[in-house]
Amino acid sequence: MMTATEIRQSFLDFFREKQHTVVPSASLMPQSPGLLFTNAGMNQFVPYFLGVWTPPWTPARATDTQKCIRAGGKHNDLEDVGYDSYHHTFFEMLGNWSFGDYFKREAIRWAWELVVERWGFPAERLYATVYAPDKSKGDPGEFDREAWDFWAELFRSRGLDPDVHIVHGNVKDNFWMMGETGPCGPCSELHVDLTPEGNTKGSLVNKDSDQCIEIWNLVFIQYNAESDGSMRNLPACHVDTGMGFERACSIMQCTNGFKDFSRKPSNYATDVFRPLFDRLEVLSGRKYADVYPAPGSKRVDAEDGTLQEAIAFRVIADHLRTLSFSIADGILPGNNGRNYVLRRILRRAVRYGRRLGFTQPFLAELVDTLVESFGQVFPELAARATTVKEVLNREEASFNETLDRGLELFDAETASAGKVSGEFAFKLYDTYGFPIDLTALLAEERGLDIDMERFNRLMEEQRERARAARKSEVVRALDLKTDAVTEFTGYDVDECAATVLEVSRQGDSLFIITDKTPFYAEMGGQVSDAGLIEIGGESYHVMAVQQIGNARAHVVEARPGLEVKPGDRVHLSIDAERRRRIEAHHTATHLLHCALHQVVSPDAAQQGSFVSEDRLRFDFNSSAVSPDQLRLIEEKVNGWIEESLPVHCTERAYADVKGNAAIAQFFGDKYGDVVRVVQVGGCRDGLDGVSMEFCGGTHIANTKNIGLFKIKSEGAIASGVRRIEAMTGDAALEMIRQHVVAKSLEIAKAVEKIKEVNYELADMGLEQVPVPTIEGKPGLTALGASDIRTVNDSLARFDASVEHFKQTALDAEKKLKKARAGQSAAKADALLNEWLSDAPSSLIQVAEGAGELLQELLNGLKKRQYAGAAFLLCVDSSSLLLGAYCGKDAIADGLSAGDMIREVAALAGGKGGGRADQARGSAPQDADPQALAAAARNIING
């Protein structure tokens, strides 16, 4: 019986023998912006099918095993994982591909050869489907007679009746389309009868039966769907096939090499998952049993511990694969889009981990086992295993606290309820980060329903608020479409003449597309150029530039008198000074990326960037960056700037450089046959620079033109994602100047506070606090220094001086407070000695003083164990403060200090309160102290 590793390798070796090039799996970060994750083997090959790229292989054939995720979006298997034997969020798709080379005969013949002749599938258990359109329903294309004939020949060779073993399929199951228009064609699927008898004669094909499983889908791309609904034959036909790896392993291993069909195959009962289960058994002390709920049931008896634990084993193993491969490809758990899907998956795994007794992070303990099984096939997993563990530990630890709190709230909320309200489900999501599917899981475990209609309504209201908050005045060419092509000349020139190709109006803006332009469009994190467009002798400001397909639209205000039409000649000129500042920040971003790899970690992968004329922003995955690391990063970047390194921008054949680990390439990015390499330092054609990246942006010619590089801030923007903001040149100097000005204001405030304190200390006859002197305030020489160490040392001395001023001011205030307290204590002691000299049973007094005196008076009464009731008023220039005290005798008589304060303060429109023995309050400054004292006397005397 073949192992999973042997099955995968056998597939790839078979097609290598058929002159296919074995290509690596694409990243799980998809090329298409419409996809959350790479979800099919064909994703990375779409540009070849569309004719955008030329296949680099001779012959034009490829084979691979592709990492895929189906969770979130249109294809979402998340909720089914664990409850049956075949759903996964992560899976491998084995495939072979032909780009205008071979077609149906070879694809079908080779599929049969591999499955039947090499792997030994019983031919009598196989059923092929071919496309048979229902013309009465307007189905596209024609009956796939070619595929039928090829399959028939193979079945007959084994003495089998083609009319039994070839099943006609409808447009839903057997016709593939890339979109409403574009490449498309019929499919032919291969199904396996897994019933014990194996004689269903095709009756279970496409009937959603787990006893007749599709193992391979062959797609024949031969048409182009036109906008009028017609089908045009393509000049070159393609083959796109996909075989579920886990499914193939299940069929071969669970039947013991096709010898025993007595039990239903399960993807989880294979050596794809067994190593993870073994490790989980060790960690949890529980045993995995390959048992499942009744078909179609999502309700699991809470008393059935074995089944509960089996589901948990499967969920954790599946989700661990999804999380680990995604993180290795640079996709991290987060709060938006695919990142939030990953966070949901992780939190679901953690919740199921509780069923196995895990209350502390445990997922990272499974990573080494996963690497042992898959690290050779997917080397990126092994290379980034440490990062994967760090991210899992961090996310899991964070969510465990949330989960504990959420479970408490859920149990309290649902203790006496028969349903989970939409408001509560939304609160768990919005306040505590509970994904709705996790709340649904908790409800399911307790047999409760959720008011999803109300939850969805609250979610939509939140989205509406978010959309309203995001509205801006920035013009976007969202609704424009064009087939025009604009040549970008901005790498070489700052201005050029051009011909208008198209003009569109949206609101108060004109979108002018020209045949060429020096204007860079907003993309790749770089802002668009600004400048002027001269039309008919008049110049107009270009507000923005948008990329629309292969064209660039210049956004201009539609002013009265502005007339422009296709064919007009115009002159375009960018704001060159602004462009140079943008270029400086862009090149500095590349240097920052390089420095991060050297100082922090080679796994500090880019998660996003923004480059403008006055700042740069760079997001990357990492744990916290220390101050020492930040200083070293600054020194490295400024060191490269001081070296006056040339910046080379060259075009290269992608095939020549795609494997060069020294060139930064980004997960999920797809490149054409020719790529632009931006190299800082080294020889122009040597690929030996200190920094090398694929980049289509604009850059300076030499690092000396960057000027000073200074980091403004570094911090977390999401779990595991950090952000550095930095500035270069004049923008950096202005940032430092503003910092010095702001800190100087802090010094001025501190000095003013020290002087105020000293005035009072002088009045008290006490020693005053010395005012420090400013040391290290950066002058123009320091601010203009190119040596970042000089700048940072000067700033550090100045910042330390600022902190010294602020601390001196705090110490001065403490000294004054202590002095006041000492005076107040002495005064209070003297007053109480006077007031209590004849041992009165009650005490009502008015004194001049502030809050310190009132508190010392109350403290003194307590210290003297005064047994009666007291009401005290302290009056100064800015306040009227009230205090009440009740000793043991007064309390025994039913008096309460808190009640007394509340009642008396209310008479004057004030407020207050406290305990029965001691309370404080205040009244408006214009209140009559004697009237309040009289009111208190009435309360005390009853």
UniProtKB/Swiss-Prot annotation:
Its EC number is 6.1.1.7. Pfam families: tRNA-synt_2c (PF01411), tRNA_SAD (PF07973). This is Alanine--tRNA ligase. One of its GO terms (cellular component) is cytoplasm. Its main location: cytoplasm. GO terms for molecular function: alanine-tRNA ligase activity; aminoacyl-tRNA deacylase activity; ATP binding; tRNA binding; zinc ion binding. Belongs to the class-II aminoacyl-tRNA synthetase family. It catalyses: tRNA(Ala) + L-alanine + ATP = L-alanyl-tRNA(Ala) + AMP + diphosphate. CDD domains: AlaRS_core. Catalyzes the attachment of alanine to tRNA(Ala) in a two-step reaction: alanine is first activated by ATP to form Ala-AMP and then transferred to the acceptor end of tRNA(Ala). Also edits incorrectly charged Ser-tRNA(Ala) and Gly-tRNA(Ala) via its editing domain. Zn(2+) binds at residues 586, 590, 695, 699. Binds 1 zinc ion per subunit. InterPro entries: aa-tRNA-synth_II/BPL/LPL (IPR045864), Ala-tRNA-lgiase_IIc (IPR002318), Ala-tRNA-ligase_IIc_anticod-bd (IPR018162), Ala-tRNA-synth_IIc_core (IPR018165), Ala-tRNA-synth_IIc_N (IPR018164), Ala-tRNA_ligase (IPR050058), Ala_tRNA_ligase_euk/bac (IPR023033), Thr/Ala-tRNA-synth_IIc_edit (IPR018163). Keywords: Aminoacyl-tRNA synthetase, ATP-binding, Cytoplasm, Ligase, Metal-binding, Nucleotide-binding, Protein biosynthesis, RNA-binding, tRNA-binding, Zinc. It comes from the Bacteria. Its cofactor is Zn(2+). Consists of three domains; the N-terminal catalytic domain, the editing domain and the C-terminal C-Ala domain. The editing domain removes incorrectly charged amino acids, while the C-Ala domain, along with tRNA(Ala), serves as a bridge to cooperatively bring together the editing and aminoacylation centers thus stimulating deacylation of misacylated tRNAs. It comes from Akkermansia muciniphila (strain ATCC BAA-835 / DSM 22959 / JCM 33894 / BCRC 81048 / CCUG 64013 / CIP 107961 / Muc). The gene is alaS. One of its GO terms (biological process) is alanyl-tRNA aminoacylation. It is found in: Cytoplasm.
